[in-house]
Structures are given as structure tokens and as C-alpha cells.
């Protein structure tokens, strides 16, 4: 059990302390405009001096009046930025939500195409299973849908571009003529 400090209660039996006694004010006779006497002025000055002398606060939290405590709490101005009760959404979609009737158009994001070297891109196109399957169907005499035909044309055009860029000639092109031209332009002294 916690200890409680004994407090002095003023009763009829106990003698009164000086601090408990109220100074006797001489009764003023006359109207409001009466000038106070020298004795009254001295008594008033003594009271004010006593108040100035003991202007410190009493020790401990026990001595605080609840009424004064409430007044102090009311006067305290809090910073409105601290302790906000407003809920903050964690998802960005809820913050930028359009008003009713308005539509935010989605921003078209360009697809990132990794830049491959021409040799690697050509190899990937030549080894493309879908393209090879479609080319086999064309050779077999089947007709392709417009979408598939467009895909085949784009791939073949890109293969031609890459081959010209790399300086590669198609093997099917006039093998006999190319060999003859190479033989005629070749220097025979080179093989001695």
C-alpha cells in the first residue's frame, strides 16, 4: 500500500496559523471617492509586499487546483500538423481517383524492346519455331490467315534487312554464277 502524507486540517481545536489568518481590513466609511488614510495605505502595501515575496509556486502536484489545471489545458495551443486524425491512403489509385463522370485516359507506355546485336537478332529470327512452322505450311500449299501472313512478311523483311546490314548474301541466289565470278576475279599467284 502506498504511503499518504498527512495534511493539516484546520479544526476548532487547533490554533490558527499566520498564513491561515486573513488580515483584518479596517472598514471604510464614506463613498467611493474617499481618499484612503495613511494606515490603510501601509496595510495594503504590506499585503502586496508579502505577495511579491512569496510568488513561487507550492511544491508537488498535490497542490494544483483542478480548476486552474483545466484552464491551463484549454490555453495550450497545439500544432495542427502533429497528431492528425485524417486517414492517409497507402495506394496511389485512391488519391488520384477521378470525380464522377470524368475519365482519366491511360498513358500509352511504349514497350521496351531490348536492343540486340544484328547477328543475335538474325539468329533468333531464323530459329523462330512459329515462323518456321508457318513457312512449312506455305510450302505445303496451305493458305494462312491475314494475321499470320502479316507476321511472316514482317519477319522475312526484317531478315532481309539484317542480312544486307551484315553483308550476308542468300545462299540460294545463283550459286553457279557467284562461283564463276569468284574464280575469274581470284589471283592465282596467291596459292603458290
UniProtKB/Swiss-Prot annotation:
Keywords: GTPase activation, Ribosome biogenesis
InterPro entries, A to Z: YihI
Transport listed as a keyword: no
Region of interest (Disordered), ranges: 1-80
Protein's GO biological process: ribosome biogenesis
Gene Ontology molecular function terms on file: GTPase activator activity
Pfam family, one: YihI
Chain intervals with Basic and acidic residues compositional bias: 9-25, 37-48, 65-80
Quaternary structure note: Interacts with Der.
UniProt-listed HAMAP family: GAP_YihI (MF_01058)
Function: A GTPase-activating protein (GAP) that modifies Der/EngA GTPase function. May play a role in ribosome biogenesis.
Family: Belongs to the YihI family.
Protein name: Der GTPase-activating protein YihI
Lineage, top ranks: Bacteria, Pseudomonadati, Pseudomonadota, Gammaproteobacteria, Pasteurellales
